């Protein structure tokens, strides 16, 4: 099933994208036009590049994907943009990756698994498992360091 990664923007995000690329033949990316060209070209998958601050760009890019993996920035500036994009999308599964606590608006989104992590520890395994399963448990999951 097609998966789209929204806002991968650092080397740890790239590791997750690389893992998803190995297990999913139809990997898509929505990347900020502010990212370095060398980083954008290092990522696998079909790329859409646009304004990460425009939720309509993101929701349009998710069209046709089954699963969306949203990489939230450390200071959660994109939170409301992601929420609007998800609400306007047809995604059947959303995996939201964040170091911040979720709020009620996020947890009330349908079909959402919220993975809260500390410095990406043990995150990749959890993302790959959730993306590959036919059925998953939705809601908030704290990823421990051990």
What role is predicted for each listed range?
Residues 1-29:
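N-terminal Rossmann NAD(P)H-binding glycine-rich loop of SDR-like oxidoreductase domains
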Residues 14, 52-55, 76-80:
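Structural motif corresponding to alpha-helix initiation and N-cap regions
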Residues 26-30, 34-35, 66-67, 79-121:
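Conserved Rossmann-fold NAD(P)-dependent oxidoreductase catalytic core, especially the SDR/UDP-sugar
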Residues 41-46, 108-112:
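A short helix-to-beta-strand connector/capping loop
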Residues 42-66:
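Conserved Rossmann-fold cofactor-binding substructure of NAD(P)-dependent oxidoreductases
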Residues 72-74, 98-99:
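Conserved NAD(P)H cofactor-binding loop of Rossmann-fold oxidoreductase domains
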Residues 106-145:
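Conserved beta-loop-beta element that borders a ligand/cofactor-binding pocket
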């Amino acid at each position: 099933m097609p998966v789209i990664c929204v806002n991968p923007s650092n080397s740890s995000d790239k590791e997750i994208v690389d893992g998803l690329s190995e297990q999913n033949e139809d990997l898509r990316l929505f990347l900020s036009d502010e990212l370095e060209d060398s980083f954008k070209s290092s990522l696998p998958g079909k790329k859409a590049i646009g304004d990460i601050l425009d939720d309509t760009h993101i929701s349009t890019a998710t069209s046709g994907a089954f699963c969306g993996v949203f990489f939230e920035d450390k200071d959660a500036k994109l939170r409301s943009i992601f929420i609007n994009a998800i609400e306007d999308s047809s995604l059947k599964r959303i995996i939201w990756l964040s170091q911040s606590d979720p709020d009620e608006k996020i947890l009330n989104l349908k079909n959402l698994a919220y993975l809260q992590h500390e410095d990406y520890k043990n995150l990749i395994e959890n993302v790959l498992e959730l993306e590959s399963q036919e059925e998953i448990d939705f809601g908030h999951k704290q990823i421990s360091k051990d």
